[in-house]
């Protein structure tokens, strides 16, 4: 199995691997890690090859990462526009374009909220994004909410997923709000 470890910025470490989630957790020793938030993703590839590089989350900027459920129809055009702005891409994945767009907007001076709001007008398709920064994370859905997003909140955590089943094994999920 392929594994890729990247350190991005000062506060985010991106670990990518292919295989069952339980195997990837064991491979990286995630159970022993500490942090304020984690973004995980189980991918069903539709737009690009199944490779470690194509695995989520994606980052194209300091202390920013994105995981995506959905499909962007304008990612090829937007990728070319962002390349002209100096954004670098490592894959042909549409999710990396979304991460690149947000990183570019932040570099241009937008707040995360402004960048996310702008993405609703620029990114064409159906999607749910989870975006992680060094200070927290945000979830955003396309304007007509084609892709699901569910949330579980307890006194100890807040978790988002694209399906209820993904939250079943979290501690206290049966009593989550």
What residues fall within each predicted segment?
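Conserved short alpha-helical segments that host acidic/polar catalytic motifs at enzyme active sites
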Residues: 1-177
């Amino acid at each position: 199995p392929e594994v890729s470890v990247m350190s991005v910025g000062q506060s985010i470490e991106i670990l990518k691997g292919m295989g069952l989630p339980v195997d990837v957790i064991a491979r990286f020793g995630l159970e022993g890690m500490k942090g304020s938030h984690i973004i995980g993703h189980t991918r069903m590839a539709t737009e690009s090859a199944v490779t470690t590089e194509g695995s989520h989350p994606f980052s194209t900027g300091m202390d920013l990462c994105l995981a995506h459920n959905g499909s962007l129809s304008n990612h090829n055009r937007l990728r070319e526009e962002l390349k002209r702005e100096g954004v670098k891409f490592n894959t042909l994945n549409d999710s990396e374009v979304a991460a690149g767009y947000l990183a570019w907007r932040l570099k241009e001076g937008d707040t995360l909220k402004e960048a996310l709001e702008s993405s609703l007008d620029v990114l064409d398709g159906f999607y749910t994004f989870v975006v992680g920064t060094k200070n927290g994370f945000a979830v955003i859905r396309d304007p007509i909410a084609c892709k699901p997003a569910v949330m579980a909140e307890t006194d100890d955590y807040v978790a988002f997923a694209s399906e209820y089943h993904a939250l079943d094994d979290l501690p206290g999920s049966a009593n989550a709000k």
